[in-house]
């Protein structure tokens, strides 16, 4: 049995990759990293480092043209700045202005496109399961609607039926928060020092964007320092 893992180089997808490698063995795991026109390539480089660490096959796919018409703040062509505040703060402002809507860093239907593309590749590579790292914090308040349990169940059913019952989706964290994801990863020895989450592309994480804030809180909840911050500090000083 083989597994394909959507690997962005961040905490959640790297934990999912660690789980898949532990479950199926590295020789039966493929990492798929997708470019979508984001403002920097730090996460793709992190995904490469993670794949090398686990010794798994890695594939790359460029879907950037699909998102050419979006003004999502994560994308190169966007006229919007990436918000420098927590998701809770962003959602509160959005709610007051527009009601329940996604945050500006929501890439339109990204997970739907990623999973559909991954399904085609997974079937071609004789995989029977796709792993991805969506978790409950991302879906909260409709911040990222394509991370919800409802969305995951619908996509899983579509992939299962559309593949002739050959392929399913595994989203192990969809009912967990990010702190729970980190807890699992720490128990598996996931190389978080190699990961990148920040929406900015600087030498060090900005510490101010929504994903940086969530990441810091998740490690703090587990009583540990973020290994990536320590790792980058040591590299800078060496």
Predicted region positions:
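Local cysteine-cluster metal-coordination motifs and their immediate loop/turn environment
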Residues: 112, 116, 196-217
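Iron-sulfur (Fe-S) cluster-binding segments and ferredoxin-like electron-carrier domains
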Residues: 127, 204, 210-234
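Short, intrinsically disordered, charge-biased short linear motifs at domain edges
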Residues: 185-187, 192-201
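ATP-dependent adenylation/nucleotidyltransferase module used to activate substrates
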Residues: 1-189
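Short functional micro-motifs and their immediate structural scaffolds
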Residues: 25, 190-191, 214-217
